[in-house]
Swiss-Prot record:
HAMAP family: LarC
GO molecular-function terms, A-Z: lyase activity; nickel cation binding
Record-stated family: Belongs to the LarC family.
InterPro entries (alphabetical): Ni_insertion
Key words, A-Z: Nickel
Protein name in UniProt: Putative nickel insertion protein
Domain of life of the native organism: Bacteria
Alphabetized NCBIfam families for the sequence: nickel pincer cofactor biosynthesis protein LarC
Length: 390
């Protein structure tokens, strides 16, 4: 599978994203031909690329030259424009997801329904070209997964159609909900609404780069030239070929010895519903010879704070420990398979090269055991036997 990692050390914008994707191998003429499938007048815009330097780093700059006076388009106008185009279904779906996230953010900022959202800067032809262009490029390159580094917040103020606003702009701040960010960069707008919307809508994960065999690297330049670092977004494209996938997760732990054990089960349910990768209780003999439980939670980076806070509000714990751990995992996916008992969900486990096993889902087996009046173990055996060759 082909994947791409967005290294946003200096930030991200829509035009920077398209520029970096072009460096990864998208022909500019192909991009022009595909963008022409949008129901926009040919005189409304033109695109071009140039090679630039940012703090000694060679990068591509993507330009969209549009008519000076742009109408303030509503979200529904842009959604209809994309749907009416002759672009591929995958490109349409990606572009629609990005604009929907933008509309959600604008609706929250201005306190209106999504259908009433009208875009200013992001409704211009240049932003439409940036977002649809990014979708076209991702489709051309055959990207199956998109992973993104934590994003820099930036600081200061930015001039917008609504006046002078703090960085990140309100819509950008809304788009960053649930995304890991940091403040380890200088002043200025580092993440634009279009850049934030692209990764918020399309990213499969945020954090460290996944294991891959690197195929190409592309650098997309922004319009500004910062004093502290090269203003580029770096995209690393590769093939996900590792037999054992490697990533980093976090372990959250705490010891509990003064809580009604009936509540522990409820706490586990809440943690799993909140996005914990796994939850376990282990018996302990604690100080003063009291029996207790060790709570262990496996968490992704973006769920770390939320899960820790949930432990502190739903239990008697007054503190938690957490630390990163590396892990190696097999690829897994939920699929539906046909059996004599009906269509069932199973977990398909592979090493990217071959299928290793198919594991029936417990909830599916329990449901079928009740519906068919069969022993649970018999349901397991039937599903395992009938899906083995599929």
């Amino acid at each position: 599978m082909r994947i791409v990692y967005f290294d946003c050390f200096a930030g991200i914008a829509g035009d920077m994203t398209v520029a970096a994707l072009i460096e990864l191998g998208v022909p500019i003429d192909y991009l022009r031909e595909e963008l022409a499938k949008l129901p926009l007048p040919l005189s409304a815009y033109s695109i071009s690329v140039e090679q630039v330097q940012r703090k000694g780093i060679a990068a591509t700059r993507f330009h969209v030259r549009a008519e000076e006076h742009q109408p303030h388009r509503h979200y529904t106008d842009i959604a209809a424009m994309i749907e009416q185009s002759t672009l591929s279904d995958r490109v349409k779906e990606m572009a629609q997801r990005v604009f929907f996230r933008l509309a959600e953010a604008e609706a929250r900022v201005h306190g209106v329904e999504i259908g009433h959202v009208h875009f200013h800067e992001v409704g211009g032809v240049d932003s439409i070209v940036d977002i649809v262009g990014a979708a076209i490029c991702l489709d051309y390159l055959g990207i199956g997964e998109l992973h993104v580094s934590p994003l820099p917040l930036g600081s200061g103020f930015v001039e917008t159609a609504h006046g002078r606003l703090p960085v990140p702009a309100p819509a950008t701040a809304e788009l960053l909900r649930g995304i890991p960010v940091h403040g380890d960069v200088g002043p200025g707008e580092r993440v634009t609404p279009t850049g934030a919307a692209i990764v918020a809508a399309l990213a499969d994960s945020f954090g460290r780069a996944p294991a891959m065999r690197v195929v190409a690297v592309g650098c997309g330049a922004g319009s500004k030239d910062f004093d502290d670092m090269p203003n580029v977004v770096r995209l690393v494209m590769g093939e996900k070929t590792a037999i054992l996938l490697k990533d980093e997760i976090y372990v959250i732990e705490t010891h509990i010895d003064d809580m009604n054990p009936e509540i522990l089960g409820f706490l586990m349910e809440r943690l799993l519903a909140c996005g914990a990768l796994d939850v376990a209780f282990s018996p302990l003999q604690m100080k003063k010879n009291r029996p207790g439980s060790k709570l262990t939670i496996l968490s992704s980076f973006d769920k770390l704070d939320e899960l820790a806070r949930l432990v502190l509000t739903e239990s008697t714990a007054i503190g938690v420990r957490y630390y990163p751990v590396a892990r190696m995992i097999l690829s897994r996916a939920m699929e539906e398979r046909d059996t004599s008992l009906g269509r069932v969900k199973v977990k398909v486990v592979s090493d990217e090269a071959q299928l290793l096993r198919i594991v029936p889902e417990f909830e599916e087996c329990r449901r079928l055991a009740r519906e068919k009046g069969l022993p649970l173990m018999e349901v397991y055996r039937i599903i395992e036997r009938e899906t083995a060759g599929q």
